[in-house]
Each structure stands twice: as structure tokens, then as C-alpha cells.
From Swiss-Prot:
Coiled-coil spans in chain: none
Organism: Rattus norvegicus
Subunit structure: Part of a SCF (SKP1-cullin-F-box) protein ligase complex. Interacts with SKP1 and CUL1.
Gene3D superfamilies found in the cross-reference section: 1.20.1280.50, Galactose-binding domain-like
Primary role: Substrate-recognition component of the SCF (SKP1-CUL1-F-box protein)-type E3 ubiquitin ligase complex. Able to recognize and bind denatured glycoproteins, which are modified with complex-type oligosaccharides. Also recognizes sulfated glycans. Does not bind high-mannose glycoproteins.
Lineage: Eukaryota, Metazoa, Chordata, Craniata, Vertebrata
Protein name as catalogued: F-box only protein 17
Keyword line: Ubl conjugation pathway
Single biological process term from Gene Ontology: ERAD pathway
Length: 250
């Protein structure tokens, strides 16, 4: 009494049902599976399933099903800027699969941007008492973590290389003149300390040759004046014309 009915185990015939579907119908079925499950659960089933998941068709169907304004725009981008079918030696999945999995558009591509994982992902040079990670003195709206990198007394530097292709943006999309990359950072000073800040951005090609560079040098904060945070951005956005041949940000 009160026992729940046991779930029936699928028979061998039921297990075989999907395998017997023609590729066109199987493609439609797989296109309803969430992206991560497609890769981790469906791809290892057999060679036929692996080939479908590795190819672009199932991912195009997923994009086409999203009828939001953003979804329609992404689908149009994927159709107008098809990725090289030869793919990339480092990635078994097609470029469109990586795009759907990693969702690079509209998110922050800087890893560990607020120091919530210490200095992981950053190359740092220590000056004075060196770098540290502390809680924000004032709230930074929209930040993934209310922590920040702090320095002391002398110039300190931190750098990060962002591989846009590994983040899910395929090269043909970068070359298409249809997307923009926006760069910004938050900075500020303690009330009892002055502060000088510089932001430099280098755009590199796949061979790490510099394509173009930008910088921002806001006015220094004087001692005993304020301790608020402010946003800074180079006097540019990485507009489509500058992304030709670009694959990395530094």
C-alpha cells in the first residue's frame, strides 16, 4: 500500500526504434535534445549518431526552432556565414556545434574576470606589495562576483589571451563583418590612495601577429577624493571591419 508503480524497462524492440529511423527523421528527433546532452549522451551511442552530432544540420535545426528575435538573428548569421566544413584539428565537433554549446555572443569572454578564482587564467606581474583579490568596496552592477583585483604602490600588470575560436566564434563569422566585440572594465581607488589605470587591447591573428591595438587612459584618481568604481572602455568597439583575420584578443 502506498507503493509507487515501478517503471517498465524498455524492451529491446523499443531500444531499436530510434536506430531504425531514417537519417532525416533521426535528425529531427536529435534536434530536440539540449546541446550538452547531444554531445555527452547522444554522440557516443554509435557512429551514425556521432556523425549527425558532429555535423551542422542538427544544430541549424536547433537555431531555426528559436523564434525569438535573437534566435532568428543567430539563425540568419549561421546561414549567411557557414563555417569551414573541414573544422579545426583541435575540435572534433563542427564550429556550429561549439557555437551552440558555448554561446559566445552576448556573454563576457574574459575568464575569471573578477578574481573569484584567484589569479587563475591570468598572467600577472607584481609590483609593490603585488596583486591581491578583495571584496568590492562598492557594488559593481552586473558583475558575476563582488570581488576585484587590487594592487599597491607600484605598477602591476595582468594579461589574458582570449582565443575567440575556442570560445565558440568560428573564423568565417569573424570575417563576415556582421558581429561586434565590446571591451570594457571597471576600476577605482581606495579613499586614502590615489590610483592610475591603463587598459590596452591587442587584436591578434591566428599566428599571434598584431592586427590593431587600442588603449584607454582615464584621468588618475587623487588621494582622499573618492572610492567609487567607474567603467572604462577604449575609444572604440571592435566593429566588423576590424575583425577580418582576427582570432585572439590580448
Amino acid at each position: 500500500m502506498g507503493a509507487q508503480p515501478s517503471r517498465r524497462r524498455m524492451t529491446e524492440a523499443q531500444h531499436m526504434a530510434l536506430a531504425e529511423l531514417p537519417p532525416e527523421l533521426l535528425l529531427q528527433v536529435l534536434s530536440h535534445v539540449p546541446p550538452r546532452a547531444l554531445v555527452t549522451r547522444c554522440r557516443p551511442v554509435c557512429r551514425a549518431w556521432r556523425d549527425l552530432v558532429d555535423g551542422p544540420s542538427v544544430w541549424l535545426l536547433q537555431l531555426a526552432r528559436d523564434r525569438s528575435a535573437e534566435g532568428r538573428a543567430l539563425y540568419a548569421l549561421a546561414q549567411s556565414c557557414p563555417a569551414d566544413r573541414n573544422g579545426h584539428d583541435d575540435f572534433p565537433l563542427c564550429a556550429l556545434a561549439r557555437f551552440c554549446l558555448l554561446a559566445p555572443l552576448g556573454r563576457n569572454l574574459i575568464y575569471n574576470s573578477c578574481g573569484e578564482q584567484g589569479f587563475r587564467g591570468w598572467e600577472v606581474e607584481h609590483g609593490g606589495n603585488g596583486w591581491a583579490v578583495e571584496k568590492n568596496l562598492t557594488m559593481v552592477p552586473g558583475a558575476p562576483s563582488q570581488t576585484c583585483f587590487v594592487t599597491s604602490f607600484e605598477w602591476c600588470f595582468k594579461r589574458q589571451l582570449v582565443d575567440l575560436v575556442k570560445e565558440g566564434v568560428w573564423q568565417e563569422l569573424l570575417d563576415s563583418a556582421q558581429i561586434e566585440i565590446y571591451i570594457a572594465d571597471w576600476w577605482g581607488a581606495r579613499e586614502n590612495c590615489g590610483c592610475i589605470y591603463r587598459l590596452r587591447v591587442r587584436l591578434l591573428d591566428e599566428h599571434e601577429n598584431e592586427v590593431v591595438k587600442f588603449s584607454a587612459s582615464p584621468n588618475p584618481v587623487l588621494q582622499w577624493t573618492e572610492r567609487s568604481c567607474r567603467q572604462v572602455s577604449p575609444d572604440c568597439s571592435l566593429n566588423p571591419g576590424l575583425l577580418q583575420g582576427l582570432s585572439r584578443l590580448h
